Amino acid sequence: DWGLRRMVLHYAQLCDAAGGVDAFLIGTEMPGLTTIRSGASTYPAVQAYRDLAADVRSILGSGTKIGYAADWSEYFGHQPGDGSGDAFFHLDPLWADPEIDFVGIDNYMPLSDWRDGFEHADAAEGWPAIYDRAYLQSNIAGGEGFDWFYASATDRAAQVRTPIADGTASEPWVFRYKDLRAWWSNAHYDRPGGVESGAPTAWTPQSKPIWFTELGCPAIDRGTNQPNVFFDPKSSESFTPYFSRGWRDDAIQRAYLEATYLWWGEAANNPVSSLYGDRMVHVPECAAWTWDARPYPFFPALTEVWTDGANWRLGHWLTGRLGAVSLAALVRHLCLRAGLPEDRVDVTGLWGAVEGYVITSLESPRASITTLARHFGFDAVETEGVIRFIMRGRAAVATLSPNDMVAPREGDVLELTRGQETELPQALKWQVARA
């Protein structure tokens, strides 16, 4: 046996020889294997993983948490889409196995559906930008994979969204890969031929925590549209996210991680199990992807040593990026250092990542903020006693008609003023901050 089983047991023995580990995965992202059927409802690889979990337990003992890291499209069931109507919770025998301590999910679920311009569906709903935290969080338990899906590439291009429904059964969560709460808290019933079985599967509702064994987003434009893809010219699986313009964007990666961790950290979004007394999603064990053991900056700089170094620029790597600070946090810090009360500063309208900022001489906080405003393109406005920082280039937030205006006591209702042509700009000059 020189296959997967031997390799996993070899790693388990290495962990044992090293003194043990806190957690161990018997496999990761094997939907092509776990969905193979030897009969209408028999999944031999799932049983093989159960046997493997028992063998790993015999090596590592009860002090190690053992799990399987399922792909986000795999964990919740097998719906082959072959016209049979079959819908099986095929991994439930594994999730329910006493040797499995948690439900592992490699979470790369999309959190946005952003396009060019302001006419696409999400912008038309009033969301200001793809970086907006409330927008991203609205798609953690909503949007694509929860409320609707795209039936084809043509539908995606035209934003023709098909609602996720379940007919007379009224259990749409069965088909929602984002509906973790319903999947975790309900009994599961297989549906051979589309007909619900009379008895539930082995899964006990709320019986085990969910760990996001991977959680990440590439540092590429509109990465949250399709966080699971990566750009690698040498790979046959190289893709850019849907509607990405292909440039580097550290800010969207940071926005994704902040939105996700903060959302699951809220008690209202993460219920407590009545069986084991802890949260559904065990946030402390959610592992952001990816940290590289190779030392930064030698990786990615030494491409003659590591040939994948060029992929770092647009990839999921966090090494070399999390030392940056969000634009909002930096502006807020400068305001507080200037003595402004915290409740008088609103930076929720800012997005961007600042890799470094050097103040070379004595200057006021306002001067420092002005430099940032020129670079990132934002304005400061005072409303209702609060200084609000707002990015430029957003869609219109209000529309005024003549009926909204008050006529002056004297003169015309509307007055047009023409500027002196010699005072208007004669040329446009710009410089590239980062290409």
Predicted segments with their positions:
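C-terminal extracytoplasmic interaction modules
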Residues: 312-435
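Short, internal active-site loops enriched in acidic
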Residues: 29-32, 71-76, 215-218, 288-297, ...
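Aromatic-rich peripheral "rim/lid" segments of glycoside hydrolase catalytic domains that contact
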Residues: 222-325
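Extended hydrophobic secondary-structure segments that form protein cores and membrane-embedded regions
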Residues: 25, 67-69, 210-214, 281-292
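Solvent-exposed, polar/charged alpha-helical surfaces in well-ordered, non-transmembrane soluble domains
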Residues: 9-13, 50-54, 58, 258, ...
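N-terminal substrate-binding region of glycoside hydrolase catalytic domains
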Residues: 1-3, 25, 29-40, 169-175, ...
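Glycoside hydrolase catalytic-domain groove-lining segments
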Residues: 43-47, 51-67, 93, 98, ...
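Active-site cleft segment of glycoside hydrolase catalytic domains centered on the general acid/base Glu
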Residues: 1-100, 107, 113-122
